[in-house]
A protein has these predicted regions:
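Residue-level detector of Asp-centered blade-edge/turn motifs that repeat once per structural unit
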Residues: 19-21, 63-64
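Structural motif
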Residues: 32-37, 76-83
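Multi-bladed beta-propeller domains
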Residues: 1-15, 20, 29, 39-57, ...
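Cap/lid segment of the alpha/beta-hydrolase catalytic domain
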Residues: 90, 96-218, 225, 257-266
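Short loop/turn segments immediately following the C-termini of beta-strands
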Residues: 29-31, 73, 176
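Active-site-proximal cap/loop segments of hydrolase catalytic domains
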Residues: 173-364
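Hydrophobic beta-strand positions that form the internal "hydrophobic ladder"
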Residues: 24-25, 68-69
Length: 364
């Protein structure tokens, strides 16, 4: 389960509910959205109830099954509660207005969607432009890479993306191969080769956006957390096109990750082997193997109590780069878990964003 916040739920966190003795309500992950469906267990018919460009985070039904309260995420605003009335017209309306005052006090853009061709796939991507965007100017680019790996970005309001856009960055985020929501073959494309073809997809997306003419190719930055941190490490060890990078709660050594993470054993399903039987395979797909090729200035952010991606992953990478006299900085957050960015102590969550902005601004 991926913690909700700046990422679309990819493993269905909402339990399916019976509306009647025959009709089952459920959500799925589909191309950046999280639609709500009704399934009739007798006829096998599937009926969409909510299938627009939005995400049903969770829902609750009235006793008679005629009304459904929906926790809905949209790109235009932070989440609110909506009411779906299953009368003859299927009326859907918002019933909370928790963020209206806040939204009226800020200036932000809605992300623009792109479908970018890459190796054997078309990659759904979004670009969030700064407020007051001027197409004649050249802006710095920030590539954001999601975790998972089998997760997805989508149709939600991302506070983190808005922070960077407000600071003057064009923010690019994509669902490369390995993401969920596009079928089994798409999600399984990285099986046995974690960084590929995701690397090609990410670079294709950057190339595509650069061709649009409003990004400065000399001012490109990259960041990501968890698997996104793994990919950040991989990207900067295989290209020098980025001026700076921030890797968060990341993985650099798959062999040690297998033995120290609370879910490390799950790598066997992806690599069809274990590190003590096939050390070369795990070494091949570990970014630290290629650390000598890293020249991009790197800031490593990690939580000391991270059980998913233990802090030793950050320490390994930091020591290796420091030993090689590479430009690297390590920032550790005490008492925090893998979910610092989404559920950490509020002042530390703010400090994390400030650190990232500082890191990118210094180099821009």
């Amino acid at each position: 389960m991926v913690t909700l916040g700046d990422i679309t739920p990819s493993f269905v966190k909402q339990k399916a509910l019976f509306q009647t003795s025959e009709d089952l309500l459920f959500t799925v992950s589909s191309e950046g959205a999280n639609p709500l469906f009704k399934f009739n267990i007798l006829s096998g018919e599937i009926t969409p109830l909510l299938d627009g460009p939005e995400c049903v985070v969770s829902f609750s039904m009235s006793r008679d099954g005629k009304n459904i309260a929906v926790h809905l995420a949209q790109m235009e605003r932070p989440d609110e509660i909506w009411l779906l009335e299953l009368n003859s017209e299927k009326h859907f309306r918002r019933i909370t207005f928790l963020n209206d005052e806040y939204m009226s006090s800020i200036s932000c853009n809605v992300p623009e969607e792109y479908h970018i061709p890459s190796d054997n796939a078309v990659i759904q991507s979004w670009v969030l432009k700064p407020p007051g965007f001027n197409s004649k100017k050249k802006y710095p680019l920030l590539l954001q890479i999601h975790g998972g790996p089998r997760a997805q970005y989508g149709y939600t309001w991302f506070h983190e993306m808005q922070v960077f856009a407000a600071a003057g960055f064009v923010v690019l985020y994509t669902n490369p191969q390995g993401s969920q929501g596009y079928g089994h073959a798409f999600a399984d494309a990285i099986t046995g080769k974690w960084a590929e073809p995701a690397m090609n997809d990410l670079m294709a997306a950057v190339d595509y956006i650069l061709e649009l003419g409003f990004v400065d190719p000399e001012q490109c930055f990259v960041t990501g957390g968890s698997y996104g941190g793994y990919m950040t490490n991989w990207v900067i060890s295989h290209t020098n096109r980025f001026k700076g990078a921030v890797t968060q709660r990341s993985i650099c050594d798959l062999s040690s990750f297998f033995g120290t993470s609370d879910t490390g054993w799950d790598l066997e399903a992806d690599f069809h082997d274990v590190p003590w039987k096939n050390p070369e395979l795990y070494k091949k797909w570990s970014p630290i193997t290629y650390a000598d090729q890293i020249d991009t200035p790197l800031c490593i952010i990690h939580s000391e109590n991270d059980l998913r991606c233990p802090v030793e992953q950050a320490e390994q990478l930091f020591v290796r780069l420091k030993y090689d006299k590479k430009p690297v900085r390590l920032v550790l957050f005490p008492e925090e878990s893998h979910g610092l960015s989404r559920g950490g102590r509020p002042d530390r969550r703010v400090e994390r964003l400030k650190l990232m902005l500082e890191e990118f601004r210094v180099k821009s």
